[in-house]
Amino acid sequence: MRRGIIVEKNKKFVTLLTPDGQFLKAKNDRHSYEIGEEIMLPSETRMGRRASFFDFFKLRPFKMGIFTMTAIMLFIFIVLPVFSNNKAYAYMTIDINPSVEMALNSDYEVIELTPLNDEGQKVVNDIDDWEKTDFKKVIDDIITDCSEHGYVKKSKEILISTVYENTEDNTYKKAVKKQLNDVTEKYKTTYRMESLESDMQTREKAKKEGVSTGSYIKSNEKNDNKDIKDDSSKPSGEEDQKSDENEDENTDQTDTQDSKQGDNEQLNDADSGDQKEEKADDQIDDSDKDKKIKESDENTNTEKDGDHEQTPIQDPQDKGNENNGADKGQSQYHRDWNNGEQGKNRSSSRRDNASDRRNPNGYSSDNHSAKNEDSPSAPGE
């Protein structure tokens, strides 16, 4: 007799799976068989053959669906977590003098511990059981080992830099920062703890230069600060050129203003001189006119007095004296008249000279000729 489990049935036949992996087909004498039921068959009814991979595809769709769902669940709960725990989500470097880099998985566990120099290799060799250990515990072990070997002392700087594979995963980043802050708070009273973040491009550049990410960032910061100091201490060539151009423009403007001011002062001086000369000439003319008016008034008064008064009889000697006095008065009158004409000629000449200064093109004034033509002729001419 053979035993088997019913895996399929229809109205005529049932299919059995034997313990040795054979499929047997037998007649369905009883319609009350159930799938999964174990039954006994006579040996002569054996129709078996060994099960093959292709028999799986001959199962009914319902059974096929159940099997597929079971496989998916196994992959999600068994295979996928194993794969995820072996993937690096972040890289963290610790710089004391030994430099070590840790790779963290999704559970914040260390999956890789890489020394970055000879001292770092010694530290890695001294640490046991670091794989799949929380990164805070590994940091504690690294600091303790460095302290025992004299690599780190009190007040020395410990630099921790973190690089994330997926910079958009804010949940993971916040969790790492929180745990790293706990480590910093723990050691800040003993050492100078500093933490910073960077990106994958910076990490690759640091690897090419053979240094840690933190050391690479610090080195670039020093170079940038040095360049900034050099730039601030030395003015650029463009600024020098602009300042020189501004100074030249200011100098040209000052020279132009000075020249204009000098021309204006010369014109003002010439005008003031002309005005003074004209005033002096006018004063001389006024004085001459006053003298003439006074003399004419005296002569008029004398003539009137002669009409009303009888001329006294004088002896010849007195008459001769009077004639001499009259001749003297007439000569004095001629001298006064000549002096007035000379003063007018001098004032006219000065005005002509002033006019020449105001007219640099050389056009002469006709005032002198006009005045000479209008001036009265001397008595007796």
UniProtKB/Swiss-Prot annotation:
PROSITE patterns: RSGI_N. InterPro entries: Anti-sigma_RsgI_N, RsgI_M. The chain crosses the membrane at residues 64-84. Residues 85-381 are extracellular. Residues 198-381 are annotated as: Disordered. Disruption phenotype: Cells lacking this gene exhibit normal cell morphology and growth rate at 37 degrees Celsius, however cell diameter is slightly decreased. It is found in: Cell membrane. Keywords: Cell membrane, Membrane, Stress response, Transmembrane, Transmembrane helix. Induction: Part of the sigI-rsgI operon, which is transiently induced by heat stress. Expression is positively regulated by SigI via the sigma-I promoter. In exponentially growing cells, expression is regulated by the WalRK two-component system, which represses the sigma-I promoter and activates the sigma-A promoter, leading to the formation of a basal level of RsgI. WalRK can also positively and directly regulate transcription of the operon under heat stress through a binding site located upstream of the sigma-I promoter. Repressed by glucose. Its main location: membrane. Pfam families: RsgI_M, RsgI_N. It comes from the Bacteria. It is a single-pass membrane protein. GO terms for cellular component: plasma membrane. Interacts (via RsgI N-terminal anti-sigma domain) with SigI. This is Anti-sigma-I factor RsgI.
